[in-house]
């Protein structure tokens, strides 16, 4: 992922989509999974590195970190491979204007479709409300998400964390 920063001691590893990593001395597996975005760290390295999300599996829970992504079939593919996702962390902000942001950032409606595609039990929205990154007001993504979730009777499946709040997963 950060190949140029890789050293023998910093633990950075390169990964391909769906590659699995086992954490030493723990019953935890980490899978690097596809998202729809782009990458750039310098002037001449556009899309030279792979972008992605993660599925983290333990004996007690499976977490799907959807990364920074636009809507796509990858959500359904991940849900088909990992059939018991407990928590799906997905971006809901930085989506306006759609003509520019749609390929790389989910709208709240896209996030709900992705949640349904993934088959996860609980959605944890992220990537909203802290920084003004695009044209929608900072509070709009959560408002729109909860409105649409209410229309689809999904409100009880969404766990909203406040800024700096954590969620203990056992």
Model-derived regions, located:
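Cap/insert and terminal regions of metallo-dependent hydrolase folds
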Residues: 1-4, 62, 69-162
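Residue-level detector of functional hotspots within protein domains
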Residues: 7, 40-42, 55, 109, ...
